[in-house]
A protein has these predicted regions:
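Gly/Pro/Ser/Thr-rich low-complexity, intrinsically disordered segments predominantly at protein N-termini
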Residues: 1-197
Length: 197
């Protein structure tokens, strides 16, 4: 057995001493799809479970069904939080005027009203702890965390709202069958239809 020739090995970029920036995220060649920037480090996404795909589609469709004309529901788009942080929420609700066209690759945190993360096994700590903290610090007013639960592995949605005084998220509800909330707009999503996706 022989080693792979050097010219066929993938050459990963060497990180700068102070970490990567948002400029790097958008200019480094050949990054894998859905690469995120967290605290100046590039984070590559592992293959996802079917649950992840189905939950994103169920929730995105539900959010779109009642979205007001001044807002848009987008999936898997980078959100610039600061110079060293550009995560990619699974779903975001953004101001419609922030959508500039089909070549757009990012949104600014100030344009995001809701960030949704569907927990994945490889990113559970980031989805539960790191990202919510960073979204709140960047001023995103609403956050949903979605996980599998029960014997049938159905989605459970934890809904959080950012307190202006604290700048942190507080849990406002946990939804097993239906998500029914009035912020950031009137939303009703039937989680029991999950198996249709």
């Amino acid at each position: 057995m022989t080693a792979e020739p050097a010219e066929h090995r993938r050459q990963w970029p060497v990180p700068p001493l102070d970490g990567y920036t948002m400029d790097d995220l958008f200019t480094l060649p050949d990054l894998p799809p859905h690469t995120e920037l967290i605290d100046g480090s590039l984070v590559f996404v592992s293959p996802q479970r079917y649950f992840h795909f189905a939950a994103i589609h169920l929730l995105a469709n539900g959010l779109r069904s009642t979205v007001p004309s001044g807002l848009k529901v987008v999936c898997e788009m980078t959100v610039v939080l600061d110079r060293r942080n550009g995560p990619e929420p699974d779903i975001s609700v953004v101001r419609a005027e922030a959508v500039t066209g089909p070549r757009q690759i990012r949104f600014e945190a100030a344009d995001v009203l809701l960030a949704v993360e569907v927990i994945s096994p490889d990113s559970e700590a980031r989805d539960r702890d790191t990202k919510p903290h960073k979204y709140a610090a960047a001023g995103i007013p609403h956050f949903w965390l979605v996980d599998m639960a029960g014997q049938d592995d159905h989605p459970v949605v934890q809904v959080y709202e950012r307190g202006e005084a604290t700048g942190t998220y507080a849990l406002t509800g946990i939804y097993h069958d239906h998500v029914k909330v009035s912020v950031p707009y009137d939303i009703l999503i039937d989680l029991t239809t999950f198996n249709e996706y």
